[in-house]
Regions:
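Cleavable N-terminal signal peptides of Sec/SRP-targeted secreted and luminal proteins
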Residues: 2-18
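N-terminal mature-domain region immediately after signal-peptide cleavage
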Residues: 15-319, 323-563
Length: 563
């Protein structure tokens, strides 16, 4: 490692700054941690933050730890650096998304019982590597809080620990606030969760596509997040945490790149690529049959931790499913897709075991090797509806087909299923994949039609733009209507990019290929807080690569911009 020398260095809170970029190291002297500016040779960890959101649509964070230190020291230092380097972003997120100083009491009771159960499991002598790595996650979370508080001044300090760290496990809180027996029937008050209360509208939370290119040249792995406009405060992150298993070897997923948000070291979209050459993503599925929720118990591992443990410990797609399905909490239920690039050779057929999916529900799940399907069809599409019949039926989708319509609830006939089935053949390279994942011509595509006034909806396409719907439109159910809901990004992985410093093609912002560019000042959504957000989301795709020239920074080059 060499020390980074900056032309202009500002000694402020132990961070070196230059042109929007910050570099800091965590050292340990006489048993005490200290953050210092720049990159130091023998540091426990160092971090790099590029505040480029108004230039590219993303901020960029990378953190690398030193394997000469213990797992606990590396985890704490990594968390501390993240909390310190992104303290401003964490605070802005708190103001917009996390006004509540604590979770609902019923959720806190669940967390307390869960923590007690986990401590007993750690003493059982089973799955020792799993539980040691589970402990490391909690240490990293503590580091985020301490790093934030080390930087916070003035109003930034008027927050609770919960508000600083809740981003990490927000989806667990999200579901628990709804499914646990009511204590006063108070719904979770955080803005991004309010429409998930009983009786609220369903929120589709992603489109995904895996596509084999012609002649088996490569396999593209892509994901679109669907969410509200205020979630477009993004950080693309890369970690190289040199944590060890009990046999002394490095964890397989010690390097991971992901799309993410301030204050968390999981993705949340979810989209990951790892040093084990795995690509991982999901789309959320709904639990319409609430009787399943009786299976949600604190004697489990929360979803945020299971996803992090799986991407760190897995060496194959099958192993990822095995790790993730352990101690199922039944929270934040998704169809997960994992592609193993170790089982792919360009211009040759996929080898068995290359592609697995896993669908989780409270009390169970169903996974399987879908390589044969992918080999035959050349694509796999995911759109918030379970594939496996047992999961589909248990979740209550057949009744929803009758209540709503097949175009919304049927795995075979969903609008996005139809569009992917029609258009996947157009994907022949990275640029054409980018175009498909940004596609939404809802005013003209017959698949986007509905029994509505006007007679179409952007929900029936690949990248939603519900912010463009008519406010006075008439729709058969709320999910199709005007609301703060849109495709907020695209991420695309490939073997070629993965093997080039865990690279990925990324874009932040709603589609503007067939629709107008999203601008806060002209949006129908009205006056939503957006401090430090880009004013206009007309960014191109960028190729983001980590660890270029050993510096653990980001290289981002635009490659596709619709003219």
């Amino acid at each position: 490692m060499k020390i980074i020398t900056l032309l202009w260095t500002l000694m402020l809170f132990g961070v070196a700054h230059a042109a929007g970029k910050s570099v800091a190291s965590m050292i340990k002297l006489d048993g005490q941690f200290k953050m210092v500016p720049g990159r130091l040779r023998d540091a426990v960890a160092f971090g790099y933050f590029d505040e480029a959101i108004n230039k590219t649509g993303w901020n960029y964070l990378s953190i690398r730890s030193n394997d000469e230190y213990s797992n606990a020291d590396q985890s704490y230092a990594a968390g501390f650096l993240e909390g310190a380097l992104t303290a401003k972003q964490i605070y802005i997120q708190i103001k917009i998304h996390y006004p509540d100083p604590a979770p609902p009491q019923k959720v806190q009771h669940f967390f307390d019982a869960n923590a007690k159960w986990e401590e007993e499991e750690k003493k059982s002598g089973k799955n020792l590597d799993y539980w040691e790595q589970r402990t490391n996650l909690d240490i990293q979370v503590e580091g985020i809080y301490d790093g934030y508080m080390a930087i916070a001044k003035g109003a930034m300090r008027n927050v609770t620990k919960y508000q600083v760290i809740v981003a990490t496990y927000e989806y667990d809180v999200w579901d628990l606030s709804i499914v646990l027996p009511d204590e006063g029937n108070v719904c979770y008050n955080e803005p991004r969760f309010r429409n998930r209360c009983h009786g609220g509208e369903r929120v589709d939370h992603c489109s995904a596509l895996i596509k084999i290119l012609p002649n088996n040249e490569d396999v593209l792995f892509s994901h679109v997040t669907w969410a509200g406009a205020q979630t477009m405060y993004r950080i693309y992150k890369a970690y190289d945490l040199r944590l060890h298993l009990r046999d002394g070897s490095l964890i397989p997923g010690h390097k991971v790149a992901m799309s993410s948000y301030p204050g968390r070291f999981t993705s949340g979209d979810d989209f990951y690529i790892t040093s084990a050459r795995l690509a991982i993503q999901e789309t959320t599925i709904a639990i319409w049959d609430e009787s399943l929720n009786k299976n949600i118990k604190p004697q489990s591992v929360l979803q945020w931790a299971r996803s992090a443990l799986a991407y760190r410990l897995a060496t194959s797609a099958q192993e990822w499913v095995e790790w993730y399905s352990l101690y199922n909490s039944g929270l934040y239920n998704n169809q997960w897709m994992v592609f193993d690039y170790n089982k792919f050779t360009p211009f040759e057929p996929l080898r068995d075991g290359a592609f697995f999916i896993f669908e989780q529900i409270p009390g169970g799940g169903h996974g399987g090797d879908m390589t044969a399907w992918l080999r035959e069809k050349t694509y796999w599409a995911s759109y918030n509806i379970p594939y496996f019949k047992d999961i589909y039926n248990k979740c209550g989708y057949p009744a929803k087909v009758i209540e709503w319509e097949a175009k919304a609830m049927s795995w075979e006939m969903a609008a996005r299923a139809q569009i992917f089935r029609r258009d996947h053949r157009k994907v022949t390279d990275l640029a054409s994949m980018a175009r498909l994942m940004r596609y939404n011509d809802f005013q003209h595509d017959p698949i986007s039609s509905c029994n509505c006034t006007p007679p179409y909806t952007s929900q029936y396409s690949i990248s939603s733009r519900s912010d463009l719907h008519k406010k006075d439109g008439v729709y058969p159910f709320p999910a199709l209507a005007f609301r703060d809901h849109m495709g907020t990004d695209v991420k695309i992985a490939s073997m070629k990019m993965l093997d080039d410093h865990l690279g990925a093609a990324i874009i932040c912002g709603p589609t503007y290929d067939q629709q107008p560019v999203f601008e806060w000042k002209t949006s129908q959504l009205g006056p939503l807080a957006h401090e430090d957000y880009p004013a206009r989301y007309d960014f191109p795709f960028y190729i983001a690569r980590m660890d270029v020239d050993g510096e653990m920074d980001f290289d981002y080059t635009p490659f596709y911009h619709l003219k």
